[in-house]
Each structure stands twice: as structure tokens, then as C-alpha cells.
């Protein structure tokens, strides 16, 4: 269906997650969303171009090919052919034989255990990435890590959700767009975030992942945006974090908790007070964590608060 036809509101297309045909176009974010389960069925930014660069017409001619760039988060990497949904002959009549061929073609593509695993995992990845608002680059990186984990036999004996969650956690850290293990676990429906962390440690060891630890500052922009505070509050929170690091009081502390405490302090100092409960909900940490961190920071930096 043409983009001009699709941007009118609702259109008929099946959601890959729940099978609903009610897909709605979100004009504000430029996304197609399933009205039934909330899955974003298409990314707001689509790169139809090749993954290579060219610097003159000759290079372009030599490197040109058909098809879209490879996508690691598709079970077949997006390089297989697809039989059209229309299933009509040259005269415009429906062709039942082509419907059967299309059905068997789809079944064959996921007939192996690996293909079935990838199909389930990457469908879950799209749903998870949609909930966490992850960019295309992070989705592809997570799919790459998951594929390596499968090849190394890490998925065997563990749930798809825990390994996939760990792959997303690792991809977010690598891309410096952090999401906490608790956020990922909640989005996946995993009851214990430690399942994600245990699987992540296995990935680190078996895949030799070398990643810098997440800093409290990495969380600040997202938390501040969700809380609706001004740039002054964010700048003050950044200043508090830097001073706390100099004093050595952030060592061994969860970065999300430190960022949350710094924002709590900054919001009060800048006259834009946010409650501990509000910040805890955004940061996915407990109010107790915020209280402990903000008291430690205030004591170390000599800050007097009157909450």
C-alpha cells in the first residue's frame, strides 16, 4: 500500500505479534502501531539505502545491487523472497493455488529449530524495542549479539527471554542509550531482573564483551525528559554527579539510583520539586534507594535540603 494511502489513519494489515488487522498511523511520531497490543510495526526512520558508501559514479555502479540492506533482526536477515499477498492471476482473479504455495513457503522458512528460535526471539525483540523506544541501531546490535549467543550455545538451556533481554541490555550499554535491567525485565514480562543480569554476565564471559560501565550521567537526559524538568535542573544534577564522583561516593552504586538522587536534589534546589515517588517510577528504582543516595550525596557535598 502506498505511503499516501496509509497515512490517512487506519489500514488493513496484520500485526506480526497478535494478528490484529487494526494498525493505526501515529502522525506525531511517524509510526504504525497495533491498536490491539501496542507493537510498533514500522520504524519511524527507514533507511532503504545500501550499507556501503560510494565516492564516484564508477564505485556506485560496481557496488550497486538489488534489495534492501541486510537486517540482522529478521530470521532470514531480510534476504529471502516473499510471495505477494494479493495472490491474483494476470486477469485479476484470486488464485487458491498461489495461496497454498505462499503458506508452504512461509512454513519452510521457519521449519528448522534455529529459524523458529530466531523468529520467536526477533518478534519479541521488536515488541521489546518498541516499548523501550530503542533506535534502529540498538535493535540491530541486540540481534547481532543474540545470533552470536545462539551460535555459542548460550541460548540452549536458558529461556529466550533472559538471553534476549541480556542482549538488549548489552546493546544499550554499548550504544550509550542505557536501559536498566528492571526496565527490560518488566517490558519482557520476566519477574526477576536478576535473570537478565545473570544471562548478561554469561554473554560478557562467553562472547568476550568489553564494555564500559554505564555512568549516572548516561541516564540523566532520559529521566529529565520524562520528569519534564528544565535544562537548569538537568545541568545542576550533572554538576552534583560530577562532584559526587570526585568524592568517590558513586563507586559501587547503581548508576540509575545515583542519577535519580541527583535529579531529586537538583529539582528542589532549582525550585522545580519532584517527589521521590515520581522520580522512582521514572528511574525504575525504589524510593528507599533514592533516599539512601540523596542523603549520602548531601552529606558528602555539604548540601542542605528541606524536602
UniProtKB/Swiss-Prot annotation:
Bias (Basic and acidic residues) ranges: 50-69
GO MF entry, a single one: TBP-class protein binding
Keyword Zinc: yes
GO annotation terms (biological process): transcription preinitiation complex assembly
Main function: Stabilizes TBP binding to an archaeal box-A promoter. Also responsible for recruiting RNA polymerase II to the pre-initiation complex (DNA-TBP-TFIIB).
Family under the similarity heading: Belongs to the TFIIB family.
Protein name from the UniProt record: Transcription initiation factor IIB
Source organism per UniProt: Methanopyrus kandleri (strain AV19 / DSM 6324 / JCM 9639 / NBRC 100938)
The encoding gene: tfb
